[in-house]
């Protein structure tokens, strides 16, 4: 199992992801600069947190035009697994791989805390080892993590069982307490919490480890 971690100007969680996948889980991991287009040999691609291209205009709005993202569209269409964490989730919505948008938090403040979560759907390989209704805690750190979508899109997400994670205590005003969603096929997951920061007891818990182990299934 080989993992690729996309790196944009302004990414700041790419090394954390590599530490989690390679250092904690022993998965060969390759960092991919935003100008690269070669995703061959990879089983999964992770879009990490940070502030891609400074998050100018809108979070993820510029990153969507990166050459690596155009290659990612084909990778995902062929069933490749894609995980977007925080800014990576924002990029996936801008790219159109996931519906909706991430906007300013309800209270207009940056939030950095541990968030209690509930697994809503375990049909995606990322979450199948948790089981539905599993409670877990993952760190969040974002200023624009409020998930928003139309009523029609929300119904489509519900009908497709594509709401993956909900906040138990909504910290940012996300519609329907949504913390993470998948595409219809389940191979693309976007979430605002940071599983890579919860992979070792020494750094604050291991609830994220199981999610990243979904890369191996």
Swiss-Prot record:
Catalysed reactions, semicolon-separated: N(2)-formyl-N(1)-(5-phospho-beta-D-ribosyl)glycinamide + L-glutamine + ATP + H2O = 2-formamido-N(1)-(5-O-phospho-beta-D-ribosyl)acetamidine + L-glutamate + ADP + phosphate + H(+); L-glutamine + H2O = L-glutamate + NH4(+)
Known EC number: 6.3.5.3, 3.5.1.2
One of the GO biological process terms: 'de novo' IMP biosynthetic process
Active site: 86 (nucleophile), 194, 196
UniProt keyword Hydrolase, yes or no: yes
InterPro entries in alphabetical order: Class_I_gatase-like, PRibForGlyAmidine_synth_PurQ
Highest rank taxon of the organism: Bacteria
GO MF term list: ATP binding; glutaminase activity; phosphoribosylformylglycinamidine synthase activity
UniProt-annotated location(s): Cytoplasm
Pathway in which this enzyme or protein is active: Purine metabolism; IMP biosynthesis via de novo pathway; 5-amino-1-(5-phospho-D-ribosyl)imidazole from N(2)-formyl-N(1)-(5-phospho-D-ribosyl)glycinamide: step 1/2
Disulfide-bond pairs as recorded: none
Keyword Nucleotide-binding assigned: yes
Cellular component annotations (GO), alphabetically ordered: cytoplasm
Keywords: ATP-binding, Cytoplasm, Glutamine amidotransferase, Hydrolase, Ligase, Nucleotide-binding, Purine biosynthesis
Ranges of residues in domain Glutamine amidotransferase type-1: 2-217
Oligomeric form and interacting partners: Part of the FGAM synthase complex composed of 1 PurL, 1 PurQ and 2 PurS subunits.
Function field: Part of the phosphoribosylformylglycinamidine synthase complex involved in the purines biosynthetic pathway. Catalyzes the ATP-dependent conversion of formylglycinamide ribonucleotide (FGAR) and glutamine to yield formylglycinamidine ribonucleotide (FGAM) and glutamate. The FGAM synthase complex is composed of three subunits. PurQ produces an ammonia molecule by converting glutamine to glutamate. PurL transfers the ammonia molecule to FGAR to form FGAM in an ATP-dependent manner.
UniProt name for this protein: Phosphoribosylformylglycinamidine synthase subunit PurQ
Gene that this polypeptide is encoded by: purQ
């Amino acid at each position: 199992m080989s993992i690729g971690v996309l790196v944009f100007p302004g990414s700041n969680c790419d090394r954390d992801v590599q530490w989690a996948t390679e250092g904690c889980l022993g998965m060969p991991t390759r960092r991919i600069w935003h100008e690269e287009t070669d995703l061959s040999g990879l089983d999964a691609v992770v879009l990490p947190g940070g502030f891609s291209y400074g998050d100018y205009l809108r979070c993820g709005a510029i990153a969507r035009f990166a050459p690596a993202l155009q290659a990612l569209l084909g990778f995902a269409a062929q069933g490749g697994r894609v995980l977007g964490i925080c800014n990576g989730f924002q990029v996936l919505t801008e790219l159109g791989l996931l519906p909706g948008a991430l906007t300013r938090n309800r209270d207009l403040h940056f939030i950095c805390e541990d968030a209690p979560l509930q697994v809503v759907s375990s049909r995606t390989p990322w979450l199948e080892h948790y089981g539905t209704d599993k409670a877990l805690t993952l760190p969040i750190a974002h200023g624009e993590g409020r998930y928003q979508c139309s009523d029609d899109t929300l119904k489509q997400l519900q009908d497709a069982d594509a709401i993956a994670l909900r906040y138990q205590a909504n910290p940012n005003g996300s519609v329907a307490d949504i913390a993470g969603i998948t595409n219809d096929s389940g191979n693309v997951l976007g979430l605002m919490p940071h599983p890579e920061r919860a992979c070792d007891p020494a750094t604050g818990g291991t609830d994220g480890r199981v999610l990243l182990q979904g890369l191996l299934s």
